[in-house]
């Protein structure tokens, strides 16, 4: 059985910062994640994409942000249990015990859940399923691999427009197709794409893909119009994801749809179990990486008091000793 002061469930940005902050407070910490590498969705889905809304960074690549967070926590030697799912939650002597996949247990003084959206599955593009792996992708871990290609992006959300911005300087052509006239993407990103040599087609759907082993072309049909053929080497299907909390849904946590309800201390309804990041829900919640960092610090500070009621909630600033 492993034993630590704080167990962080989820190794995305909020979880990695929680690991740093627990170490800063002198607490031992373990980080558990079902994915094989730290970084959560950033590492799995968009490591090369530029992120523009993290304080102090005009723009930072996803993989660089993750690397910096891991380096920030490294002096405190957090234990990473990656490729390992936290499946059960129980209590022994009023302390949480996590049951891990494979039968191991992790006993801790407090749990901080930073599971993001939970496990996520891309929504499929029906006409393209036979080309998965040979022309259709749901994320682009290495954008440079699409250099000189004709790229078709399907979707109207932030991911679709972010990929258009990222791929336009590399690809021979970029076409973005959305089935509606209005977009869910941030207005500033839409305006940026409109200013680039990216073709945007609205009220349209991809009705057919051409190719033998690999994609060579696509047909798009505008509502009420005829099909149009265009050359395509890669289709980026940015249609969103279906999320699943997995075993967390069976732990007895109070849920609001797929999110964990927390109070102002980031405490859940279960003793010594806190949460931070996109997985949380409270009045006025805004799901940003930046807000997740603050929530992680709040959760860890309150977890520290749960471990030792005599401890100060605010430990001082990290710069106080310099």
Q: Which role fits each region the language model picked out?
A:
Residues 4-30, 163-165:
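N-terminal Rossmann-like FAD-binding beta1-loop-alpha1 element of flavoenzymes
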Residues 36-60, 186-190, 194:
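Conserved N-terminal glycine-rich FAD pyrophosphate-binding loop of Rossmann-like flavoproteins
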Residues 149-170:
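Rossmann-like NAD(P)H-binding beta-loop-alpha module
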Residues 23-44, 174-184:
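Glycine-rich FAD pyrophosphate-binding loop
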Residues 67-100, 105-108, 168-264, 307, ...:
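A Rossmann-like FAD-binding core segment of flavoenzymes
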Residues 12-14, 37, 119, 158-159, ...:
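Residue-level detector of alpha-helix initiation sites
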Residues 124, 129-147, 234-290, 294, ...:
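FAD-site-proximal beta/loop scaffold in flavoenzymes
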């Amino acid at each position: 059985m492993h034993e630590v002061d704080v167990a962080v469930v989820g190794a995305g940005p909020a979880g990695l910062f929680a690991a740093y902050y627990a170490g800063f407070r002198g607490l031992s910490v373990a980080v558990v994640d079902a994915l094989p590498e730290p970084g959560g969705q950033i590492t799995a889905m968009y490591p090369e994409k530029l992120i523009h809304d993290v304080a102090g960074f005009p723009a930072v690549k996803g993989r660089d942000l993750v690397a910096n967070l891991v380096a920030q926590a490294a002096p405190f030697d957090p234990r990473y249990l990656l490729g390992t799912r936290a499946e059960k939650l129980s209590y022994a002597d009023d302390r949480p015990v996590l049951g891990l996949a494979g039968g191991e247990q992790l006993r801790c003084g407090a749990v901080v859940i930073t599971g993001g959206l939970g496990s996520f599955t891309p929504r499929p593009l029906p006409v393209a399923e036979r080309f998965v792996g040979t022309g259709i992708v749901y994320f682009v871990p290495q954008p440079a691999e699409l250099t000189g290609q004709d790229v078709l992006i399907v979707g109207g959300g932030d991911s679709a427009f972010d990929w258009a911005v990222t791929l336009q300087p590399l690809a021979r052509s970029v076409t973005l197709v959305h089935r509606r006239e209005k977009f869910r993407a941030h207005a500033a990103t839409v305006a940026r794409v409109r200013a680039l040599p990216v073709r945007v087609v609205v009220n349209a759907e991809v009705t057919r893909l051409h190719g033998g082993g690999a994609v060579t072309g696509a047909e798009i049909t505008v509502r009420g119009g005829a099909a149009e053929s265009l050359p395509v080497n890669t289709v980026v299907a940015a249609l969103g994801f279906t999320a699943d909390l997995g075993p967390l849904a069976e732990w007895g946590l109070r849920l609001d749809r797929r999110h964990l309800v927390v109070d102002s201390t980031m405490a859940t309804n279960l003793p010594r179990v806190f949460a931070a990041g996109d997985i949380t829900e409270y009045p006025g919640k805004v799901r940003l990486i930046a807000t997740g960092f603050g929530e992680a610090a709040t959760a860890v500070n309150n977890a520290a008091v749960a471990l030792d009621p005599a401890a100060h909630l605010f430990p001082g600033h990290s710069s106080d000793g310099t």
